[in-house]
Amino acid sequence: MPPVDNAYKLRNQEYLQEYAQKPGVKIMFNGVMYREISKGSGPKPSPKSFVTVHYVGKLINGKIFDQTQKGRPATFRLNELITGWITAMREMPAGSRWEVVIPYNLGYGSRPAGAIKAFSTLIFDITLLDVR
């Protein structure tokens, strides 16, 4: 395993502290944070639900590491996603759009995952289109 980049880890922790102070931010029981961009009125998913979403995933420097293609949403079984997504999506009514901020321990953790460095805070813009 590569050595820990303590400066990067600290920047990610500072980002979480700053984000928590923004107006409209809600902090969930395990540290996942979100800001409601638009409110939906559909059902909330259960862990075994299939969710159809549009999303953009970014790091704290603004670099996009993953996203759905325009006009082509993605469908996932909720309980197969990272813990931070599961936590947020369980409270998100279909039709909603949220900005979700996930601490590293509820994302990809202390190990790198592709272009995502260890200890990365993940920022997602998620629109929940459908729950089945």
Ranges and model annotations:
Residues M1-R132:
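Cross-family detector of peptidyl-prolyl cis-trans isomerase
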